[in-house]
Amino acid sequence: FAALLSTAFDKNVYDKKDDIDELSARPDFCICGYPVISYDKCIEAGQRYFPKEVIIANVLSYKENILKKYNPEELASPEMPPVFVFETDDDRTTLAENSIGFYMAARKAGVPAELHIFREGGHGFGCGDDNGQTGEWKQLFVNWAKSLNII
């Protein structure tokens, strides 16, 4: 969702009702940890466990148009905020290609971006084990954010 907010912040998705709706929803920066970015890559990752037909019929078919319409890779623009992405190579839930694709889309748009793919750590490690490899993402983010004067 962070990638979507960072790329679709200017989309009208509801009728404005209050003054606050006039404020920009653009975040100052984006952190994506092991993100699902692309519909096609989501299908590909799911095929590790289920046939493609099952995934489409039971999980994604009703959302297909929305998922394709709001693909952060396709919506990346120079107006989006700087992007910090991290992932593990052994993540069995999301493919590293999601992270790589979003990083490349941000770069192509001329947006400051940084990508880290750790060799191992799986999926869902959150803030990670400070003693493990994945725990390094927090300090890497701080260093990156300082280099851009975000913090």
Tell me what each language-model feature is:
Residues 86, 96-151:
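C-terminal catalytic histidine-bearing segment of alpha/beta-hydrolase fold enzymes
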Residues 38-39, 90-94:
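Acidic catalytic loop of the alpha/beta-hydrolase fold
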Residues 23, 45-62:
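A catalytic-pocket lid/entrance helix-loop region that shapes and gates access to the active site
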Residues 16-20, 60-75, 80-81:
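Active-site nucleophile elbow and catalytic-triad environment of alpha/beta-hydrolase enzymes
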